[in-house]
Amino acid sequence: MSEQNNTEMAFQIQRIYTKDVSFEAPNAPHVFQKDWQPEVKLDLDTASTQLADDVYEVVLRVTVTASLGEETAFLCEVQQGGIFSISGIEGTQMAHCLGAYCPNILFPYARECITSLVSRGTFPQLNLAPVNFDALFMNYLQQQAGEGTEEHQDA
């Protein structure tokens, strides 16, 4: 066999944790007496930090705002963190891992936390749809490449 500089990729979840939680219902209790037809806004953000060689913290911030007209019914924010051991990849592959793969792992935990908080606030059940972090990451890369560049698709 020919000699290759073949570093094997390794990925391990060390810990998943809730880093920060906030729930506000600024217009309770009178908001409970209104017809429940909210406008729900979902904001997502990710951040990653290298903690040590091959050890990274990824934080997924999920903010949900439900409004009835001009009034905020509730505002819920969860920062779901994870510590991951990742080795054998670099560059765009590492950026994809930290910006899409890890958030895909963290999102169900954040979604469950938000659902629980909304329920404890006695609001109707909130079911957040799955998020395609791979597509969001690709959009981010395209934005970074600048407007007017040709789109590339992976085969």
Swiss-Prot record:
Keywords: Chaperone, Cytoplasm, Protein transport, Translocation, Transport. One of its GO terms (biological process) is protein tetramerization. GO terms for molecular function: unfolded protein binding. It comes from the Bacteria. GO terms for cellular component: cytoplasm. Pfam families: SecB. Belongs to the SecB family. One of the proteins required for the normal export of preproteins out of the cell cytoplasm. It is a molecular chaperone that binds to a subset of precursor proteins, maintaining them in a translocation-competent state. It also specifically binds to its receptor SecA. This is Protein-export protein SecB. The gene is secB.
